[in-house]
Regions:
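Active-site helix of classical SDR
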Residues: 55, 96, 104
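Residue(s) in the substrate-gating loop at a strand-loop-helix junction
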Residues: 80
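C-terminal substrate-recognition "lid" of short-chain dehydrogenase/reductases
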Residues: 116, 152-177
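Alpha-helical segment proximal to the catalytic Tyr-Lys
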Residues: 60, 109-113, 172
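Substrate-binding pocket helix/loop in short-chain dehydrogenase/reductase
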Residues: 7, 31-32, 36-41, 144
Length: 177
């Protein structure tokens, strides 16, 4: 996902692109004062730069699509509640997700004239293969659950439903969220 030339080649081989779900991301929890530069650069490259590049390449393909009555499409960026509220030992992740919120707002304005909608899904903590390792720490798990108003972790199916809705015609007037 971070190799621009490879991604560009893959995108350009597609006959058309209607939907992009930008869901690549990672997190390396570190206290702000202990963030290693290599970790920060890695996270920015995956969470921000790769997201930007993939969205731009797909938007260009959507705009250039032939044999369409109208240009259009949907881009759904996967963000996080950390893009709104932040959290300890996640300074770089918070920064990436706040940046993704700004990127989505700007993209939605720039791409609206092409009928391309751009939105984010900002879930709470979701149990995934990536997050399972964090949940092994009982203190972390307890503190995380205490900060989720519903008192439970999100299920992948709950997040997928939001993505499907935003990518569908049912959300045809929703952009910039």
């Amino acid at each position: 996902i971070t190799n621009y030339d490879e991604i560009k080649e893959i995108i350009n081989k597609q006959s058309k692109i209607d939907i992009l779900v930008n869901n690549a991301g990672n997190n390396i929890p570190e206290h702000f004062t202990k963030v290693k530069t290599k970790n920060m650069e890695y996270l920015v490259k995956i969470n921000t730069v790769a997201t930007f590049n993939l969205a731009q390449l797909c938007a260009l393909r959507m705009i250039k699509a032939k044999n369409r009555k109208k240009i259009g499409g949907a881009i759904v960026n996967m963000s996080s509640q950390m893009g709104h509220v932040g959290g300890p030992i996640r300074s770089v992740y918070n920064m990436n997700k706040w940046g993704l919120e700004g990127l989505t707002k700007g993209m939605s304005l720039d791409l609206a004239k092409y009928n391309i909608r751009v939105n984010t899904v900002c879930p709470t903590f979701v149990v995934t293969p990536m997050t399972k390792k964090f949940l092994k720490n009982k203190k972390f798990k307890r503190e995380t659950l205490n900060n989720i108003p519903l008192g439970r972790f999100a299920e992948l199916s709950e997040i997928a439903s939001s993505v499907v809705f935003l990518a569908s015609d049912a959300a045809s007037m929703i952009t910039g969220t």
